[in-house]
Amino acid sequence: MSGAPLDDKDRALVAAARDAIRQRYRNEWQEVGAALRTRDGRIITGVNIDAYLGRMAVCAEAVAIGRAITEAGDQGIDTIVAVRHPKPGETDQSIAVVSPCGSCREIIYDYDAKARVIVPNGDEPAVATIAELLPNKYVRGSGRW
């Protein structure tokens, strides 16, 4: 992973994701917020949609991507980030950057193979490319694994 440091635009994107989950947090239901910046500069946010049946849940990144397509058209994903809101009883109450799960890595790559992803990296988040986070991606119909 390249682990490039965040610039001001990246920090603003993290702040947008934090604001989204801070406004919509519901313990056991909405715990993750995401924000993406389209290639034309728009910032779109989303929060996860949890469900009693876990496999029915939808990640915050997927919600943000769906909103971006609906509201902005397919402009591509310049950068995306997800953050997790702590539960009330947790010692650390900071809203922290989290890595996208495997399914989210797949969908981010599917919608923009050149997307930048803000990920945890020790004390400070860093930027990686989706290709770095999902090497050797399977491409349907290519015979490639």
Model-derived features: positions:
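C-terminal binding/interaction regions
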Residues: 2-27, 66, 71-145
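Fold-independent oxyanion-binding glycine-rich loops
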Residues: 39, 47, 60, 120-122, ...
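Short beta-strand scaffold segments in enzyme catalytic cores
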Residues: 31-38
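Short acidic, glycine/proline-rich loop/turn micro-motifs
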Residues: 46-49, 91
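Compact, glycine-rich, soluble single-domain proteins
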Residues: 48-62
